[in-house]
Structure formats: structure tokens, C-alpha cells
């Protein structure tokens, strides 16, 4: 299926999800971000509705992964970076320096490009994060681990080997373990940064199917270089170029009748 036909087959998304004044789960307002003197994000404004999948597309270096990292303040881990504007999570500005970052990152989970299982058992990969926030009995923890692995579409494959190392799993299974680890903390938003770029087509299809299931319970933002993937999994799509938000709207509209020539040129492969 082509990018355009995949996008066209998706149900239309109400225009309200891109109304900057509409209620949003996550919203950026006049957002600017700097790596030292380099401005990586330029006056970003967008609203992401709850229980939708929003894809961020654009050429390498356009700022899409940077934007994702601003959503849970990963940039705080590195010196010399600066942010201006607002990022709202349920109308609370997460850029407030008084905010508890551990609690923020529990609410806004992240799955990275390369699977990053901990060097411990499958069970402990899930339980470790839960223990940082909650004190559960053994039976309660067992239940949470099972539910998390079910949420990551992995339970049936690992239920008989929970004491095996997470590193013993295949690449696709490791990525689903990372998703389960994120789900275990009961976040409200899940950020995916190129989650399938290191996976084979079969594993990619499983992750995409899982994302479609997860949006029933979570708000999802995904960065991808794969146009077909963006068209398949997302409800709304944002095209970014040179740190700017060029276009943001329902995926079927962005792919079939983009409003900006740069969007059309990128989607049709004229650059990028």
C-alpha cells in the first residue's frame, strides 16, 4: 500500500484535534529550543488530542526527535540546552523548573530507537520501575508484571520464562519488553522515537499493531522516517523542516492534499 492510499484509508479525524484553542492532552505554545547557540525548534505550536496517534515526519535534523524529548524534558540530562515557551500536559506547564521530573517521566513514558532492556530478568525489567514509585506485595507485583507484558503483547511468548534475561529475547521482543516496561508505570502519554528502525518487517508489523491497540488507553506521539508507517498508524501528522512546524493536520489530509508545497515535496520524495 502506498503512503497516500494508506493515509486515505484511515477514518477522518475531526478538525478540533488540531484547533490550537481546543482541549489537548499535550500542547506546545510558542516553543523554542536551543542547543547552545543553535536553535533547533522555532516557535512550535500544536495540540495533541488524547487517545490519538500523532506522527512527526521530516528529514534528518529537522527537530522532530528534539521536540519529542522536550515533551518529557529529557534535555534536562544534558548541559547547555535552553527552552522557551510552554509545553502543557493537561494544562499544566511541564517546563516549570519546580516540577518533579521523575513523576513527569512516569506520566510521559518514552520508547527509544534501539531496544534498551535492562541486564536483568524479564520479570525484573518490568518490576524494577514499578518499585521506584509503589510498594506492592508479591502477588500484586506479579499481577502488574503480567498486565504490563500483556500490554506489550509479549506475555504469551515469555510467561514460561520470566526468569530468563531480557537480553536473551529477539530484537522485536526486546522492543516490546521496553514498551511493556513503559506501560507498567501507567503513563498517560507514550513517546516513540523511531521504534521500528532497527527491526525486521514482521517485528515492525507487531509494533504497529500494538500502537493501534495502545491508543485506546494512551496518547501517543511517534517520530518516524517511514512514510508508510506514518500513514498506517497515525491519526494526525506533523511535518517539520529546519526546526519549524510546516504543517499539522489529519493524516489523510496531510498525505493526500497537503497545504504546503514543502510537505508535498517531502512526501513524494523530492527531498529528504
From Swiss-Prot:
Subcellular location: Cell inner membrane
Record field: catalytic activity: phosphate(out) + ATP + H2O = ADP + 2 phosphate(in) + H(+)
Top-level EC class: translocase
Residue stretches making up the ABC transporter domain: 26-267
Residues engaged in binding ATP: 58-65
One GO term describing the cellular component: plasma membrane
Lipid bilayer topology: Peripheral membrane protein
The keyword Cell membrane is assigned to this record: yes
EC number: 7.3.2.1
Keyword Translocase tagged: yes
Subunit organization: The complex is composed of two ATP-binding proteins (PstB), two transmembrane proteins (PstC and PstA) and a solute-binding protein (PstS).
SMART domains documented for this protein: AAA
Higher taxonomy: Bacteria, Pseudomonadati, Pseudomonadota, Alphaproteobacteria, Hyphomicrobiales
Organism the protein comes from: Nitrobacter hamburgensis (strain DSM 10229 / NCIMB 13809 / X14)
Gene name of the encoded protein: pstB
Family assignment from sequence similarity: Belongs to the ABC transporter superfamily. Phosphate importer (TC 3.A.1.7) family.
Protein name: Phosphate import ATP-binding protein PstB
PANTHER family on file: ABC TRANSPORTER I FAMILY MEMBER 17 (PTHR43423), PHOSPHATE IMPORT ATP-BINDING PROTEIN PSTB (PTHR43423:SF3)
Swiss-Prot/TrEMBL keywords: ATP-binding, Cell inner membrane, Cell membrane, Membrane, Nucleotide-binding, Phosphate transport, Translocase, Transport
Amino acid at each position: 500500500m502506498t503512503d497516500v492510499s494508506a493515509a486515505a484509508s484511515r477514518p477522518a479525524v475531526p478538525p478540533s484535534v488540531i484547533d490550537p484553542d481546543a482541549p489537548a492532552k499535550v500542547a506546545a505554545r510558542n516553543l523554542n529550543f536551543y542547543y547552545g547557540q543553535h536553535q533547533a525548534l522555532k516557535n512550535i505550536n500544536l495540540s495533541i488530542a488524547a487517545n490519538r496517534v500523532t506522527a512527526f515526519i521530516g528529514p534528518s535534523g529537522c527537530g522532530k526527535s528534539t521536540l519529542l524529548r522536550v515533551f518529557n524534558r529529557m534535555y534536562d540530562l544534558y548541559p547547555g540546552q535552553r527552552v522557551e515557551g510552554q509545553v502543557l500536559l493537561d494544562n499544566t506547564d511541564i517546563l516549570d523548573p519546580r516540577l518533579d521530573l521523575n513523576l513527569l517521566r512516569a506520566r510521559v513514558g518514552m520508547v527509544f530507537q534501539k531496544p534498551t532492556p535492562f541486564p536483568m530478568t524479564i520479570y525484573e525489567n518490568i518490576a524494577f520501575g514499578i518499585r521506584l514509585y509503589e510498594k506492592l506485595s508479591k502477588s500484586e507485583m506479579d499481577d502488574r508484571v503480567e498486565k504490563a507484558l500483556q500490554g506489550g503483547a509479549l506475555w504469551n511468548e515469555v510467561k514460561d520464562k520470566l526468569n530468563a534475561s531480557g537480553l536473551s529475547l529477539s530484537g522485536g521482543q526486546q522492543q516490546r519488553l521496553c514498551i511493556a516496561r513503559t506501560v507498567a508505570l501507567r503513563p498517560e502519554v507514550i513517546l516513540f522515537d523511531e521504534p521500528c528502525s532497527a527491526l525486521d518487517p514482521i517485528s515492525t508489523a507487531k509494533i504497529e499493531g500494538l500502537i493501534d491497540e495502545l491508543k485506546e488507553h494512551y496518547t501517543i506521539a511517534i517520530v518516524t522516517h517511514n512514510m508508510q508507517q506514518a500513514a498506517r498508524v497515525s491519526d494526525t501528522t506533523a511535518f517539520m523542516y529546519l526546526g519549524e512546524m510546516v504543517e499539522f493536520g489529519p493524516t489523510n489530509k496531510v498525505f493526500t492534499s497537503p497545504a504546503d508545497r514543502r510537505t508535498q515535496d517531502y512526501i513524494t520524495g523530492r527531498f529528504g
